[in-house]
Amino acid sequence: WYGHNPIRVVLDRTLSLPNDSQIFDGNVPTFIFTEKEQPEKKNITYITINFNHNPLKQIMEALYQRKIQSLLVEGGRQLLQSFIDNELWDEAYIEKCPSRLHSGVKAPQMDDNFSYSIEEHFERQIWHYVRRL
């Protein structure tokens, strides 16, 4: 993607990320969603939400209020599955490899009801681009 650095959106329920993490460098506007109130710092805005009461809805509403209309989600299985289950996605890039892993975390599960789907092969990897119905 070309253009300016995107606004970083971080979920840190208990503010457990190390203070020396790059996300705290202040170089890029950053929103941190947390349960703990915290004063703003240079380019860092802390947004307090209740993680026990539909946190994704609160996050999406807070981003909408700040006129953010596009969100690229990178995360682990639980976060990605939550976005999928709550139908909070329009398109997805899925990378698959034919190699079998015998342990680890399973990938998020999606149904196959896509309005649009492309599959491309790169050496041993398969890339899927899909849009939701």
Model-derived features with residue positions:
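Enzymes that bind and transform nitrogen-containing heteroaromatic metabolites
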Residues: 1-133
